[in-house]
Regions:
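Generic helix N-cap/helix-start motif at coil->alpha-helix transitions
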Residues: 23-33, 58-68, 97-103, 139
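Residue-level recognition of tetratricopeptide repeat
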Residues: 36, 71-74, 103-105, 110, ...
Length: 154
């Protein structure tokens, strides 16, 4: 961690995330971390199970919990549940500096684009561009802009 603080840079989203994490002394919540790793490995049922009984300790962990549920259900193919959790994440987090609401909005744009509901897709892609958040800003906003470009004229 100290090496990241001394030699790290913030030119790329992943480096910014590592540097921000190194500068924050608090440890990540173990249940959220396990759920994220299980999700990344494609173990959606186990990731969902890891979040059973989770109790948020602050606003950020509460928001991440809702966001993680949306991501799990989305990749699990349970779109209606994902939409509900993404919408809740946006409602609770769009004015906070965390990336959860912005990425939820991006994911809703993607979902509605795939459903050929271009008006809704545009609404959520534009919402991303109007949010202020710290983590993954470059990649999330670029993906939202790419989504807008894809649906232009539809």
């Amino acid at each position: 961690i100290e090496r990241i603080k001394l030699r790290g840079n913030d030119q790329v989203d992943n480096d910014r995330e590592a540097l921000a994490l190194a500068n924050k002394i608090s440890k990540p919540d173990i249940h959220l971390l396990k759920a994220r790793l299980l999700f990344d490995g494609g173990y959606y049922a186990r990731a969902r199970q890891e979040l059973d009984g989770f109790k948020p300790t602050d606003v950020k962990t509460g928001l991440e919990y809702i966001y993680r549920l949306g991501r799990i259900y989305h990749n699990w193919g349970k779109t209606d549940e994902a939409i509900s959790y993404y919408a809740e994440t946006i409602r609770k987090g769009e004015n906070l500096p965390y990336y959860f609401a912005a990425n939820s909005s991006l994911q809703l744009g993607i979902i509605f684009e795939k459903q050929n509901d271009f008006a809704q897709a545009k609404k959520y892609y534009l919402k991303v561009l109007n949010m202020n958040f710290d983590e993954y800003q470059f990649s999330i906003t670029n993906k939202a802009q790419a989504g807008l470009n894809r649906i232009k004229g539809k």
